[in-house]
A protein has these predicted regions:
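Carrier-protein-dependent adenylate-forming modules in NRPS/ANL systems
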Residues: 1, 16-135
Length: 135
């Protein structure tokens, strides 16, 4: 009850009044619809790299399956340590497909900040690139 009062105070009325079965489509659902509609269209450009919806869907599905087998899912957190990249986008989508929440970590953050974030969120898994793995 106190939480509902606080949400009302913050102005989040849509969440409080929307019927439970009337939720908007999720990001993975919207992405799947677009990937089915135009699989060979470019979904993302990062520098000289362009990735189609099909490629992004396949890459995020592979990672989502690995994360799910490691326990990622609703109520869980997955840490993502990436610079801005196509891999970061695929990883975010993969985490969302599992139903878990993602914790984005900027590699330029000081170690003490990263340690605090990890200690606070207690992620069940972490994803990064080989060059950032030592962080």
């Amino acid at each position: 009850e106190a939480e509902h009062a606080r949400l009302k105070e913050l102005g989040n009325h849509a969440v409080l009044t929307r019927p439970a079965g009337d939720a908007p489509p999720s990001i993975p659902e919207l992405f799947a619809t677009q990937a089915a509609r135009a699989p060979e269209s470019v979904a993302l450009v990062c520098g000289d790299l362009s990735v189609t919806y099909r490629e992004l869907d396949e890459a995020s599905n592979r990672l989502a399956h690995r994360l799910a087998s490691a326990g990622a899912g609703p109520g869980r957190v997955v840490a993502l340590l990436f610079s801005r990249s196509a891999e970061a986008v695929a990883s975010i989508l993969a985490v969302l497909k599992t139903g878990a929440a993602y914790l984005p970590i900027d590699p330029s953050s000081p170690d003490v900040r990263i340690e605090f974030m990890l200690g606070d969120a207690k992620p069940g898994a972490a994803v990064t690139t080989a060059d950032l793995a030592e962080r």
